[in-house]
Amino acid sequence: MAIVWPTALGVEQYAAAGRNVDVPRLGCPGCKEPMSFWGWYERDLRVGRSQPLLVRRQRCRTCAASHAVLPSFMAHGRLDAIGVIGPALEAMVAGHARRAADALGLPYTTVRDWRRRFVARAEMLAIGFARACVALGAPVPRLSGEAVAVALKALGAAWRAARRRWGPGVGHLWRFANGLTGGHLLTTNINPPWSST
């Protein structure tokens, strides 16, 4: 399982820190007990070029579950950084999928896959992002139209509400979305943590 850790570090800073990156000890999402550090694993992340990054693992002593602690710029199961994926999704919803792929220097098939996953999950994401607005004490904007556009609008409203409450430390829109979905914005078999509640 993966947990998204909201960090202000950029990809380059995180990579340069290596094993010295200061990852906090988190509570187990399953049983809420404190976890202990349980090593690292290497994973590639592409932002223009692919580079190896170390990801911290933590293990719960109570339920024995282990979790990868992904920095907020890293999406679960995706090679590309969330800061690359998110703007491409926005461009695709606007009908510019091929242009988005060309601008990013990525294969069209990669960008098309992101769109397919986002479209498949759009209703669930729209509901979750609207629920986040309510939880943050913000009004839910009028949501109508295609599910993908509704999901983007609800995400924007939730992000603005979070920034009003907590300030710029919330990070940019797509890091916020990645954290809110537990890294599962585009996963195939795993839903965001809030989807079952």
Walk through the language-model features, giving the residues of each:
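Long C-terminal interaction/binding lobes of large macromolecular proteins
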Residues: 1-10, 20, 124-197
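Feature targets compositionally biased, intrinsically disordered low-complexity regions
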Residues: 9, 17, 38, 47, ...
